């Protein structure tokens, strides 16, 4: 298996006389060791049901694949579906399936259950992220009913701060039977099923995103002469207002002197503050949104439309790296660098930006001042860009580059 710019190291996981290996990226959850909560969930599940109790399993929020791939390794006859909203997690799950000689596993991207097309799983299992908001968690706990066969099981682990909330929510559901509730080492495991009188809830459910389970608040934003509306989401940065790095990018957009760009690419858009500012200030003909986080893409698209950007001008590219998978060049690239992905990934992104831009096109990049200094130093040995400007503010910087 070839190395990639996101790779950090390989972890070994020994379980039930099976040794598994997992490639991890430093920007994925639990890249130092296999998560304790994941191990607790697997141990509890296998001790109660054995390794061959379930024939069709859905691993929700699969990360780099520990739960789903381990269950498949222990019982090769079962069918496994795994999904995550993070394209990098999905990529590493696929790599780890290959690394462990596992075939016949469906691994794909989805925001909640939105892109799950089958509804006859006998086990839905998840290590629920600690950053998820309570509406997101309760939506998942309820929506699982629409994807289970009759008598199917939901098995989850949560961090202790969510234990009381989960227990209370499940306890008041008239059609839910809690089969197990166990806690240890800062985590709590729940097993539950929907009873025979669940009725309408066992039908496929509507999209959680469309129902608004991810929304945290609606707000009006004022920054300098810019006014816009936002619906902000849980588990994305800048829920109250644009942060320093977004402000630097918005100021750089205000300072552009060239004619309005025909096509712009916005990467890692978060809640969409910078994307909305670019739309209102520049009125581009097309906006390409690029991110590995599907929630960020959907939220930003929604906020652009909320601020009267026509939906047919927006294109979403859910992928790792900065690019659109098309041959069309863009006039302007704007975004915040993901520093946690590491220096190799950042350098690869700079190369991708050069590939996307037309000659004379500009890139507006924000990051910590340390990261921007490293980028400028690296560009001294390259010939793709002219450094036009750098602005600093409270440990952050914006860098303006022009494509030669």
Segments predicted by a language model, with ranges:
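A SAM-dependent methyltransferase catalytic signature shared across enzymes that methylate proteins
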Residues: 102, 166-180, 193-198, 375-389, ...
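N-terminal auxiliary segments of SAM/dcSAM-dependent transferases
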Residues: 1-15, 27-31, 153-219
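A short SAM/SAH-binding and catalytic strip from SAM-dependent methyltransferases
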Residues: 122-135, 331-344
């Amino acid at each position: 298996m070839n190395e990639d710019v996101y790779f950090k190291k390989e972890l070994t996981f020994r379980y039930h006389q099976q040794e598994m290996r997992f490639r991890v990226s430093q920007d994925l959850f639990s890249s130092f060791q296999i998560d304790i909560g994941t191990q607790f969930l697997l141990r509890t599940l296998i001790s109660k049901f054995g390794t061959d109790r379930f024939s069709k399993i859905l691993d929700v929020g699969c990360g780099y694949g520990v739960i789903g791939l381990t269950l498949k390794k222990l019982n090769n006859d079962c069918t496994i579906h795994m999904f995550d909203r993070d394209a990098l997690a999905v990529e590493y799950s696929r790599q780890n399936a290959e690394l462990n000689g596992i075939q016949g596993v469906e691994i794909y991207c989805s925001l909640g259950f939105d892109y799950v097309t089958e509804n006859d799983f006998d086990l839905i299992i998840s290590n629920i992220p600690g950053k998820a908001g309570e509406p997101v968690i309760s939506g998942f706990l309820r929506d699982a009913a629409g994807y289970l066969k009759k008598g199917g099981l939901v098995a989850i682990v949560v961090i202790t701060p969510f234990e009381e909330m989960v227990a209370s929510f499940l306890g008041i559901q008239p059609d839910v039977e809690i089969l197990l509730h166990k806690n240890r080492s800062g985590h709590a495991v729940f097993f539950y099923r929907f009873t025979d009188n669940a009725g309408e809830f066992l039908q496929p459910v509507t999209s959680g995103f469309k129902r608004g389970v991810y929304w945290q608040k609606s707000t009006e934003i004022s920054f300098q002469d810019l006014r816009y509306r936002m619906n902000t989401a849980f588990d994305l940065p800048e829920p109250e207002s644009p942060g320093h790095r977004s402000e630097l990018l918005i100021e750089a957009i205000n300072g552009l002197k060239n004619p309005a760009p025909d096509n712009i690419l916005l990467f890692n858009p978060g809640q969409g503050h910078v994307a909305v500012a670019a739309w209102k200030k520049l009125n581009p003909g097309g906006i390409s949104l690029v991110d590995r986080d599907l929630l960020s893409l959907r939220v930003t698209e929604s906020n652009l439309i909320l601020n009267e950007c026509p939906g047919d001008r927006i294109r979403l590219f859910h992928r790792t790296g900065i690019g659109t998978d098309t041959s069309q060049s863009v006039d302007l690239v704007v975004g915040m660098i993901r520093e946690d992905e590491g220096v190799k990934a950042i350098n690869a992104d700079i190369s991708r930006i050069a590939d996307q831009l037309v000659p004379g096109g500009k890139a507006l990049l924000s990051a910590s001042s340390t990261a921007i200094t490293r980028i400028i130093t690296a560009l001294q040995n390259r010939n793709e860009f002219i450094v036009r400007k750098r602005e600093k503010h409270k440990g952050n910087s914006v860098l303006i580059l022009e494509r030669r």
